[in-house]
Amino acid sequence: MMTPTIPVALFDRLLVEGISPHELVRRKLMCLFNSCVVPGGETLPPLLTRGMPEWHEVNVGDKRVLNWFCRELRAAILRYEPSINMLEVSVKDAHHQTLALSLEAMLQDEPEPLRLEIAYSNGRWR
């Protein structure tokens, strides 16, 4: 029985032969999280403006602001990764220098969701 795969570019397939769709998307998301949005990038092509929305200036004590940030992040992820059909983003923990998120995504042709727990600390997402 063949396992379902997600359509990816030829270059991606050549680099990641044998990697599961979940692992491939996880790696791509980690690249997204460790990149920044270009300021004033509204006029640039989408290929040049992918990146993580900045959260350091967000009031982490305000739930409405955190919900807004989750919506912005969700939109950025869905623009970046077309193999995600459904995505939920929620804040697990938020402090001045750290932010912990929970992501649950349904990928094309995959019966099981991809679940990620990701946290920002010491200048990078892990």
UniProtKB/Swiss-Prot annotation:
One of its GO terms (cellular component) is cytoplasm. Pfam families: GPW_gp25. It is found in: Cytoplasm. Disulfide bonds: none annotated. Transmembrane segments: none annotated. InterPro entries: Anti-adapt_IraD, IraD/Gp25-like. GO terms for molecular function: anti-sigma factor antagonist activity. One of its GO terms (biological process) is cellular response to oxidative stress. The keyword Transport does not apply. Keywords: Cytoplasm, Stress response. NCBIfam families: PRK14128.1-2. Interacts with RssB. Belongs to the GpW/Gp25 family. IraD subfamily. Inhibits RpoS proteolysis by regulating RssB activity, thereby increasing the stability of the sigma stress factor RpoS during oxidative stress. Its effect on RpoS stability is due to its interaction with RssB, which probably blocks the interaction of RssB with RpoS, and the consequent delivery of the RssB-RpoS complex to the ClpXP protein degradation pathway. This is Anti-adapter protein IraD. It comes from Salmonella paratyphi A (strain ATCC 9150 / SARB42).
